[in-house]
């Protein structure tokens, strides 16, 4: 994958990070999932499409709430691990760019995009999501990030990533106001904007794994030799 506005156009492939992604990026605490359920989404008798599902973190962890899930990802290796980790669940996974997906009208109650919306071609995808959603359906855009200016460990970790990959643009996140997106048009209205803090605990090993599985390190951004130096 290559995006001009991400990492200055440097190519990356999440499938190359799948081993570490599967092991170290299933980090959302129960509070995160309970917040989604509390808002009335992804629950029993709903059909949900998870875009850029990765290793199926969202469908796997929310399966217990009773929704019927489909997860899609562009990276075949991500879907390979999603299927392995979902072997006890009735979750359907598809390998495809999200922009190439085709579903019938009114197919889903909810469409989710977690940690991924910036990668999509919105001109293609947004009309499709509008078509796929049932009347009164919902499109959830979710994002969780560390705050380097509030955590010395996060700040130093970003410095180390940038030492070996100065083109990485995933740095420097701060708290910000959730603005109404300009792509809404007459297709969507905003029903909820929510921001909250969550404490996520890491060991030395799990934090190392989480950073290695970020776009700046493990997605083909660095060679094996460069990764060894970073480690």
Model-assigned labels for residue ranges:
Residues 1-43:
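Conserved class I S-adenosyl-L-methionine
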Residues 101-110:
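A short acidic, Gly/Pro-enriched loop at the edge of an enzyme's catalytic core
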Residues 191-231:
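C-terminal helical/coil "lid" or tail adjacent to the Rossmann-like core of SAM-dependent
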Residues 130, 134-200:
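Conserved catalytic/acceptor-binding region of the Class I
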Residues 120-129:
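A short, conserved alpha-helix within the catalytic core of class I
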Residues 49, 55-100:
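Class I SAM-dependent methyltransferase SAM/SAH-binding core
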